[in-house]
Amino acid sequence: MRPPTTARCPGRVLQNPWRSFWPLTLALFVGMGQAQRDPVGRYEPAGRDASRLRRPGGSPVVATAKVYSLFREQDAPVRGSPPAELVQPSWGSPRRSTEAEARRPPRAQQPRRVQPPAQTWRSRPSGQQQSAPRARAAPALPRLETVQRPRAARGRLTGRNVCGGQCCPGWTTANSTNHCIKPVCQPPCQNRGSCSRPQLCVCRSGFRGARCEEVIPEEEFDPQNSRPAPRRSAEGPPSLRRSSVARESTTARVRPPAPQLQRARTLSGLSQTRSSQQHVGLSQTTRLYPAPAASGQLTSNALPMGPGPERRDGAPQAAYLDRPSSSWGLNLTEKIKKIKIVFTPTICKQTCARGRCANSCERGDTTTLYSQSGHGHDPKSGFRIYFCQIPCLNGGRCIGRDECWCPANSTGKFCHLPAPRLDQEPPERGPRHRAPLEGPLKQSTFTLPLSNQLASVNPSLVNVHIRHPPEASVQIHQVARVRGEAEEAPEENSVETRPSPRLPAGPGPGRWDSNRIPARSGEAPRLPPPVVPRTPALLGRCYLSTLNGQCANPLPELTAHEDCCGSVGAFWGVTSCAPCPPRPASPVIENGQLECPQGYKRLNLTHCEDVNECLTLGLCEDSECVNTRGSYLCTCRPGLLLDPSRSRCVSDKAVSMQQGLCYRLLGPGTCALPLAQRITKQICCCSRVGKAWGSLCEKCPLPGTEAFREICPAGHGYTYSSSDIRLSMRKAEEEELARPSRDRGPKRNGTLPRPAERQPLRAATGTWVEAETIPDKGDSQASQVTTSVTQLSTWVPGGALGTPTPSVPEQGIPEAREEAQVTAPTNVLVTPAPSGIDRCAAGATNICGPGTCVNLPDGYRCICSPGYRLHPSQAYCTDDNECLRDPCKGRGRCVNRVGSYSCFCYPGYKLATSGATQECQDIDECEQPGVCSRGRCTNTEGSYHCECDQGYIMVRKGHCQDINECRHPGTCPDGKCVNSPGSYTCLPCEEGYRGQGGSCVDVNECLTPGVCTHGTCINLEGSFRCSCEQGYEVTPDEKGCKDVDECAIRASCPTGLCLNTEGSFTCSACESGYWVNEDGTACEDLDECAFPGVCPSGVCTNTAGSFSCRDCEAGYQPSALGHTCEDVDECEDPQSSCLGGECKNTAGSYQCLCPPGFQLANGTVCEDVDECVGEEYCAPRGECLNSHGSFFCLCADGFVSADGGTSCQDVDECAVTDRCVGGQCVNTDGSFNCVCETGFQPSPESGECVDIDECEDLGEPICGAWRCENSPGSYRCVLGCQPGFHMAPTGDCIDIDECANDTVCGSHGFCDNTDGAFRCLCDQGFETSPSGWDCVDVNECELMLAVCGAALCENVEGSFLCLCASDLEEYDAQEGRCRPRGAGGPSVPEARPGAHPPGPVRMECYSGQKDQTPCSSLLGRNTTQAECCCTQGTGWGDACDLCPDEDSVEFSEICPSGKGYIPVEGAWMFGQTTYTDADECVMFGPGLCRNGRCLNTVPGYICLCNPGYHYNAASRKCEDHDECQDMACENGECVNTEGSFHCFCSPPLTLDLSQQRCVNSTSGVEDLPDHDIHMDICWKRVTNYVCSHPLHGRRTTYTECCCQDGEAWSQQCALCPPRSSEVYAQLCNVARIEAEREAGIHFRPGYEYSPGPDDLHYSLYGPDGVPFYNYLGPEDAIPEPLFPSTAGRPGDRIPLPEPPLQPSELQPHYVASHPGLCCCKNGEEVGSEAVSLPSSPSAHHCQQEHQAGFEGLQAEECGILNGCENGRCVRVREGYTCDCFEGFQLDTAHMACVDVNECDDLNGPAALCVHGHCDNTEGSYRCHCLPGYVAEAGPPHCTAKE
């Protein structure tokens, strides 16, 4: 490969290398992507473009291909630059060309220094040439060496950029990886620049150059040109001037150049011109850059060049040419006023069903939209289009015709120049106004070639922007100029619609008014070569998460893959979804592609910009979205908080911490049954526990109301935790918010900014909207508001905006523009505008924003509202930041608000408000009480000062403390100093003290000689005392010692004679057993045990004056005198007798002789020998069961016990006379067989011979047309038909239709024909006659006893009437008695005869003992008056009305059948109520027979008390029996407990096996209770008090049986206590809560559960007959069994009461606390639909819909494997989950409820089982307490016995 040929400039001079550097740098960025390396590391073009770049001469590509040497030195000359005449001239400026040349070395040579050319040329304005000094030669670019990867043992290189097992040139491996993804820049990038691609440095702001080695100069602002300029250009006046060459009118004559031309430098190479004459506009030098077309060639930017003014950027542009333009600089878009855009929309909608979503797209009509002045709008289709004739580079965005909005890193008309350094203040932005469109629109941009242009060269590219609904996508077919219409009259935009084939036609063609611009004449158009348009990005559905492996939470609009995965999306797809690829943590460029981190998107080839997620619909539900850098925040209004999902606002009342009482019962005006602890309102009302809350008894809101959703946003059973929710009312911090990218514009230097003129568009609603607005810097929500045309996220410099001017004539040079006029005050703007246009009406009401628009003849004026000011753009009002003026005057912190401000005063100041003005005023602290006590207060600014009084000192601000003068030693030198407030006092010293340094010190009297003779002197504070020697005592004044007469004390020589001496005494003549000690002061005891032979077989213990024998050996005891040990006859001691054997005494011990069947254990107890172990005494005909001292055989079926029960023999079943009737009996071992005769067969149930019914088994063929009659053992055939049939002529037997006679059943019934017979079905009130052939009336008055009570009964046909004796009374069918007319409650309408009365009222039932009030205790809830008063109740109703006496008339009316009988609801006989026995055990549940078992009888009930209890008829419960009154608890202390007792023994005694006696640990016991010393049968099941299913293989004790699997024990079938009782808890030493849990699983009310095992524990009634809701508290009680059996047998008219039936699936649907379940009175419907139970026609319950997302499910409906065992399946919004029972926790990995090991949980609230051992169980745990402790519940623990 050879270097491209270069051409020298023939006679042209390049003036300034700075003006050519930036355009060529841009060409470098584009050209490098299409180039390849040469062997020395340089880039050469690749592919078919290589030949073009090697062309000699004036191709514009040559400048691009030769730009690389500029990086060596920017002032180096460049060879082969194009001739100056081929460069596109700017408007009114001389043509410029590059000044430097670069030369590339040959391929095989090392780079060498470039030699400068012999001569360079500089261009003059007149076109002459002059010589210029030579430029410096640039140093050679160093050769790029191939970077070798580190020699690490990581294996072979993988991934991209790998060439031949090594990293490709320019790449190296990243740290700790084997991937070649790290680019290499040599030499490295300077000034902290980053190497983004090989040999490509991305510079930080403020730096530039190939290696970021150059600092960008600071800029100055030229107020006349409004363009940035380098601060270093100090030459020339501030007004940068350059001559302009203009063309007058439409002729080709050239105006002479202006005099006094001065050269000026601009930062970006743009030459700017301002003429003092009539030349108006900004001139711009055209730069070359590669267009993003497929050809890869560099094309012009299609700048308008034609004559006349051209409106660009809102300002008139005049172009003047000094010569005809060449073909390379043609104006390709000149006079393009009307554009035709042909596109086809595709509407895509999402359809979701059963958790699956699918996109359905429908292609719309092909629409042709004619856009004039760059804008077009289809008001019917909802599409808005504007196009750009120029492409915007580096991520720029087209916002109008020939107008680019550039990102922060670029500037210039096409965003092709690097941005200046960001060290200046950004321009202030106006607020963005959301366009009043019909709905949110989405913008799509397409870069397409413009067809039908005026020049036959490379087509110009335009950007077409289409705003359309989000669910639509658009395909552009053609963008073309409308030919032949340039000379026509002013045109209007129009829309043409062409229906697509096979689809219904879309909206028809429509027209709309737009801005009319006069058309101008132009050159004839020439067709361009065809170019394939670019395909828009594919749109799909964006999903936020997945659920059960499927994509979920889709966004409502279709998005592109990059927009979805780069912002909030996790999955994306069109027909199916795929996960989004991972994003890097920071921007990374790999293989030329820029990878942006999450929350950012590509701005250009090297920069990423923040994604405004708040533009995405559906992110923050019921909250406000705030965009942040790389993410977003959901904020709530004051009073609302974000929930844990951070996407939903809930009321702060949902997490209120205010606590109060929760009431479980709400009556008329009263609250009752409060909970013991105070809880919050949401826990009380959201958990269904409470009905009212708080000190004011606030009623809990009803579900579905707004008040309920306010405190329970998640519904019933769920509350929010305050620790999971944080207040979100703060504003996002400045560093969190996403700042829009911005171009730092120049400072304004006091001049007014020129507002951008925007062409108004007419929206579909007919209102006027702005085509574009400039964002305001102070608007915090600028990044969240979209305009009606496009969404912009960048700032533009103020100088880049033009100034609105009046219209100009079509031909000729425009006059000098008028400057904008500003009038006082500053918030009023007068803007010139074309006459005749009402700007205030055109801008609707928001043209000025928060202000008033005043129309003027030449414009309009904005009068801003208070708190607002005129925006620097002079176009509207914006918020006035009053804080900039320091309205708080430094006394507080100013916080600006929209239209106002707030002062937060510092300490020492207070807020003073006067209208809209706020200020901080000083607080006079001296006026406040308690300030500067004991001092003088002086107020200061923001504070105060205290001056203390004399005698006080300041210790802290505002507090004067007394000075303690006594601290100074010289205050009182001869006395005691006493301090006083503000002063002090000197006092004289007391006796024993002397003055010293202001205080009194003690005098040491012990220093005086002769003090305390016969003792020691002890100095005291102010005195002294004497401590005397032994034998002396202190005198009364304690200042001397005297002798003690020891003999006067009785304790001296108690066993001898005492003699007193001075200071001592002596003893003599001691008693027996004592002797005088050595010093003679005492008679000491004589130790007899020191002599040998004392106390044989024992231990000698010395005593005072004697001795004794103690601790005799085993079998011995001390004698009567205690001097010897004698043998003990243990057989005479009842406590030492052999238990179950005979005792024999021995020397020092005894022996036990056991009877047969027993064996000696522990030497003292005869234990039973288990003969069944190891021996098969009863096998194989029975099972051996051990007994006390023997055994017996439990024989199998067919065997009987023999030999005294020790063996089993066969039973001869054939000995029974009636065995095997119709056959012969054959006895077998353990059974028998029947050999049946012909016509008989063995019965599969009993084995007996039963007759074979041949007529039934063989059917009709057996007798043919004859009738078959069965007989024992045979059958016979009889000629004729069965009764009820007649023989047809064909010989067949046909049924006789007796019902053909209409009168066969009379007039009160109808006939029902049956096969061979008929029956009469009678009307209500009639019954079948004895003959069965007709219906007769039923006399209810005779049949039903006292059916009308005390009223008269009158029988009528088919019914009966109850008549009252007095006309002033009427019969109340509901109460069953006569009542005065109009008295007592609401009138009851008269029921028709035979109608069922409404259901009775159900209320509370009370009972009381004889010596207490009748309403002392609550017996039951939800009972009728008859159920209460006819059974055990003494009071009924809310007011506890007393039940009538049994001998009263009222009692007969309520209970006509007597005590114990109640009416059956829904069961009627002949129009009368049916009465049956009341099951008190079911009706009152735990209210009866507490601590026992309730057994229903007819009538009444009986109580079977648990062991340790006796029945108390007065209280109707089993009360504890005090065993301590009956038994002595021998040798110990008896303590009674509930249902039992305990014996406590004192050491060395211990409790024996009977637990009732304290015995010596070495002795035995006797007379133990049978159930403790005996091992007996353990029965596993008890059915109707009959024991079955014995525990095979072993016998157990009573405790072992009942505490494990047994329900009864011993051959007497002794029942075990219920597992939910206290007796069971004490017997088995477990806590009460454990006993309740073992009794069965009790469910939470209000839910639907999965099916459970069909056993006793899962039924609606517990093992002790108590309904399961008993464990849920009285508030959850249900009125009656909800599954009553009323079906009975077919012939029963009065169904007998049966236990509640267990449904096939455990579905507690009708619990009282179930959502929507109401206790309805009188059959009313309360709040929802009343549903009748199929088994009870009169029983109603109210049912309403579950709250969505929180209902329970049955197993077959649950979407979880195994249906949540140990829990319940609950459907939530995301699918299914398990609500585990207590003691289980959810394992989310397996979606199962697993047991919680409470014993291993060291993080629990308290240590478990203190004073005991913790044993984990399935779903719970139990505590095994140590001796001396008993188990307690809540939480389970062990407490000491009382």
Curated annotation (Swiss-Prot):
Presence of the UniProt keyword Phosphoprotein in the record: yes
Main location: secreted
Keyword terms of this UniProt record: Disulfide bond, EGF-like domain, Extracellular matrix, Glycoprotein, Growth factor binding, Heparin-binding, Hydroxylation, Phosphoprotein, Repeat, Secreted, Signal
Biased composition (Low complexity): 107-120, 132-144
PROSITE patterns tied to this protein: ASX_HYDROXYL (PS00010), EGF_1 (PS00022), EGF_2 (PS01186), EGF_3 (PS50026), EGF_CA (PS01187), TB (PS51364)
Pfam families listed in its UniProt record: EGF (PF00008), EGF_CA (PF07645), hEGF (PF12661), TB (PF00683)
Tissues showing expression: Localized in nuchal ligament and aorta to the fibrillin-containing, microfibrillar component of elastic fibers (at protein level).
Protein name: Latent-transforming growth factor beta-binding protein 2
Organism field: Bos taurus (Bovine)
